[in-house]
């Protein structure tokens, strides 16, 4: 798995290779990672990457030429055109299922927009998919890109150190995760459910599934409804 990130602020991505699961996976060479600054592919002495939008309006837009040249450079280095993802408020929602789908691409290039966005011609001709991390606006695509990368890295075999860790995460089966407890067994008058202490694995799994259903129904009724519809459809077949 290789990630190439087009960004005006490459220093922001050092967090991925310096801490947590993504750092360990990087050190274990489970994925490759490189940042590309489109200013490198400008032709003027000011290294201009943005300009005013035609038709007027506030803000500036990232220009087509530097972005296209950056993708071309990535293509030359990788040896094939990567799957290009633009982090955009207009994109499809980033979900656990979407992360799994993206795993099918060995080379993923993430485009981090700034200002008021990027020239539509780049989106139409170069971008393969637009992805949104939520219905809110942030200053650029860097944080959304890091969220997407972290989510994908967790799915790489060996990244978490325990094969079932990713499988038990929230959303992996369409449900929220169940409650978890650790030592001490008693704290501030609160205990741990007896079923988790008895060591009966079948009962523990049943309890966890029931708790996942209950928690999803209470906290995310939209997911709960979708889960029921999916499993009812499967049973009908």
Curated annotation (Swiss-Prot):
Function: Specifically methylates guanosine-37 in various tRNAs.
Pfam family, one: tRNA_m1G_MT
Family: Belongs to the RNA methyltransferase TrmD family.
Domain of life (superkingdom): Bacteria
Lineage, highest ranks first: Bacteria, Pseudomonadati, Pseudomonadota, Gammaproteobacteria, Thiotrichales
Transmembrane segment boundaries: none
Protein name: tRNA (guanine-N(1)-)-methyltransferase
GO molecular function, one term: tRNA (guanine(37)-N1)-methyltransferase activity
Gene Ontology CC terms, in alphabetical order: cytosol
Major subcellular location class: cytoplasm
Species of origin: Hydrogenovibrio crunogenus (strain DSM 25203 / XCL-2)
Chain positions recorded as S-adenosyl-L-methionine binding sites: 113, 133-138
NCBIfam families assigned to the protein according to its UniProt record, in alphabetical order: PRK00026.1, trmD
Compartments, record wording: Cytoplasm
């Amino acid at each position: 798995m290789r990630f190439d990130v087009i960004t005006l602020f490459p220093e922001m991505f050092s967090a991925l290779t310096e801490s947590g699961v993504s750092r360990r996976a990087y050190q274990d060479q489970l994925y490759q990672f490189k940042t590309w600054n489109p200013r490198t592919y400008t032709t003027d002495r000011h290294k201009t990457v943005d300009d005013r939008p035609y038709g007027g309006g506030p803000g500036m837009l990232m220009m087509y030429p530097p972005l296209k040249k950056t993708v071309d450079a990535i293509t030359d280095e990788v040896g094939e055109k990567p799957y290009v993802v633009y982090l955009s408020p207009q994109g499809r929602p980033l979900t656990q299922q979407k992360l799994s789908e993206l795993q099918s691409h060995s080379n993923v290039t993430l485009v981090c927009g700034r200002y008021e966005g990027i020239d539509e011609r780049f989106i139409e001709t170069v971008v393969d998919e637009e992805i949104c991390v939520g219905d809110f606006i942030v200053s650029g695509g860097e944080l959304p890109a890091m969220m997407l990368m972290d989510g994908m890295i967790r799915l790489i075999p060996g990244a978490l150190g325990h094969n079932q860790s990713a499988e038990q995460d929230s959303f992996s089966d369409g449900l929220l995760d169940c409650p978890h407890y650790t030592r001490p067994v008693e704290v501030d008058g609160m205990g741990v459910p007896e079923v988790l202490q008895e060591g009966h694995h079948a009962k523990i799994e049943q309890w966890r599934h029931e708790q996942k259903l209950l928690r999803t129904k209470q906290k995310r009724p939209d997911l709960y409804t979708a889960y029921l519809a999916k499993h009812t459809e499967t049973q009908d077949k």
